[in-house]
Amino acid sequence: MKLPATSLFASLALLLGGCSTLSAPFHREPPRPGRTTLGSPLVVVSAQTLDNYLIVEARWDRNGPYHFLVDTGSSVTLVTPALAKRYPSTNATIAATAANAPRVRVRSADGGIAELLPATLRRLELGDAHFDEVPVLIYDCAALSAHLGVKIDGVLGFPLFRETLLTLDYPRSRVVLQPANTTALIPGTTLPLDDANKTPLIHVRLGDRSFVALIDSGSDAPLSLNPVGLEPSFANGPRAGATVGTLTGDRPEQVGRLAETLAIGDFTLPRPIVNLTDELSTVGGAVLRSFSVTFDQEHNRVTFQRDTHDPILSPSQRSAGVSFNKTPAYWRIAGVVPDSPAARAGVQPGDLVTRINGEPIAKWDLTRYEQLIATADHLAFTFLNGTAESEKRIAVFELVP
């Protein structure tokens, strides 16, 4: 799972991806909700696409709306302490078990370990889809909320949808839920899921080599690639990139453009941009957003559908050379890309930014900042030094041409 430090590059390279408990998904079946009920044969939940993530909104009480990020790369569901407190299980046995349970050790995307408290959520609703007695881990989503500019109440892991046919329809900004035994044919390219424990692992191809990758809607990256055994060739890079955050801390990123074509079924991505990893390779939101992706856990298969089979092109990745941890009052520099204009201007980790192009950072949400990076030649950052402010003009550059 990736989590902030916020990497405000062309697309902010961070957050969730591949969070799992140490014993799941590879050694035992992840927990499923106690009961899943669909109020109709087709439940459509509106979603907002932010930085390649699908954020669903749910309303079922006067305390809502609630916002959840859908993370197929996670074998656990996370909720905030406030939501867990509001909806504790009323089942005495379940509640007692959760109250006495030890912290759960969770592995993040970089292989680090964090410990989170377990709980059972009495109720979770997505439109007409009701999930009861949901096993969860408690996590403070404040940093994630600050990054996205939306209050996030939880992260919905893949096992939550075990008893449904789950469709992440990125082009139409929606999530569709159907009964698991739905037999209607789904258009598109269908691939088998590779793991008996229902983890969304598929075989993809790089040139003439096949490898296993996790379908990870909780990552905003296009492809995180473990190069071991593949010996990939690069058209550009790899080079040092963003500072990204995980459950266990910040880490630098290595990014580059491959010289080969990646294939998912019969869909192709020529010369894609990849982030290098020493963990499991993943297909992230920057690629998934081109598709409607349907997960059929009942039959161990996934279907990719889009309106065209034209190659999916990867545009250049532009950057201001800095990554941030965000707060309402300022953005703190979390990392600086080596040999970037920002590094040459003397920007350092820990510096505080209060304004961008003369406007307070409170006026800069995720979408607006991304649009600026995509079009601007320079940015003017105002830095806070004690009680004094100073401005530095930083060139935007192509991190990966």
Predicted regions and their residues:
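Bacterial N-terminal signal peptides
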Residues: 7-18
